[in-house]
Amino acid sequence: MSQPSVILATASYDHTIRFWEAETGRCYRTIQYPDSHVNRLEITPDKHYLAAACNPHIRLFDVNSNSPQPVMTYDSHTNNVMAVGFQCDAKWMYSGSEDGTVKIWDLRAPGCQKEYESVAAVNTVVLHPNQTELISGDQNGNIRVWDLRANSCSCELVPEVDTAVRSLTVMWDGTMVVAANNRGTCYVWRLLRGKQTMTEFEPLHKLQAHNGHILKCLLSPANKYLATASSDKTVKIWNVDGFKLEKVLTGHQRWVWDCVFSVDGEFLVTASSDMTARLWSMPAGKEVKVYQGHHKATVCCALHD
């Protein structure tokens, strides 16, 4: 199977993962996934594999194959896996789960390599661009930085007590992190390197972005925009310089669960409970393609172009 230049995948409560031709909107591959719903999708940096974070396992699929079977299954979590991602060379994978743990997996060997206890259910995990720190957010409102070299929590903060941290995003150059919560608020920090090379958080901005839940926040690769996807059916685009609202993307009929930027930041893909994924032009702020085919809520999407 020849690999398309743009890999676009979505997953739904209909127990399928679908691959789409980004330009035409045609679904060219469907993976049936009866064991569980999929919470998160992530494509490896080399475009070879797609990770599906499920309940309670992670499965790795070959992007270039038509096989419905995963090439690897990662079992060790005991509850919903809510976050998954890869180190820049795809040597290892990280995950976060509602079982209260953050885990590291070596893609070249079976089994969990490292485990960090967050206690509360983990909703979101991101990898710092330095590749040596993971930042997690949990249901109790805690944000923790995990030092992968020291194997310990090097920093902990609570932006809003007893308010779940739903999503985290870190700037590509490692200078900023944004946390979004269930009350529609985004907290922005400047990231500083401490005396012992530990990352320190300097409060920068508090943004009341939506009246409903924020389900995903994401900084664009060009370090220009912050996207916030919400239960209010919209995605809002904020200019990182001052966090002024630039655009509101409207068209979805239900909650917007996920979003992902193209590598140049010119396009955004969104996934919604209205059973669709959509492609948006950032300069125009307009919808340019709808991906239809799922029979239930589309809850996550992955893009690698």
From Swiss-Prot:
GO terms for biological process: long-day photoperiodism; regulation of inositol biosynthetic process; regulation of raffinose biosynthetic process; TOR signaling. SMART domains: WD40. It is found in: Endosome. Disruption phenotype: Reduced growth and unable to flower under short day conditions. Retarded growth, bushy rosettes, development of multiple apical meristems and unable to flower under long day conditions. WD repeats lie at residues 1-30, 33-71, 76-115, 117-156, 160-199, 209-248, 251-292. Keywords: Developmental protein, Endosome, Growth regulation, Repeat, WD repeat. Expressed in the root central cylinder, root tips, emerging lateral roots, vasculature of cotyledons, leaf stomata, leaf stipules, anthers, pollen, filaments, and vasculature of petals and sepals. Coiled coil: none annotated. GO terms for cellular component: endosome; membrane; TORC1 complex; TORC2 complex. The keyword Repeat applies. Component of TORC1 complex, which is an essential cell growth regulator that controls plant development. Acts by activating transcription, protein synthesis and ribosome biogenesis, and inhibiting mRNA degradation and autophagy. Involved in regulating amino acid accumulation and the synthesis of myo-inositol and raffinose during plant adaptation to long days. Involved in the regulation of plant growth and abscisic acid (ABA) accumulation. Acts as a positive regulation of the ABA biosynthetic genes ZEP, NCED3 and AAO3, and negative regulator of the ABA catabolic genes CYP707A2 and CYP707A3. Belongs to the WD repeat LST8 family. The target of rapamycin complex 1 (TORC1) is composed of at least RAPTOR, LST8 and TOR. Interacts with TOR. This is Target of rapamycin complex subunit LST8-1.
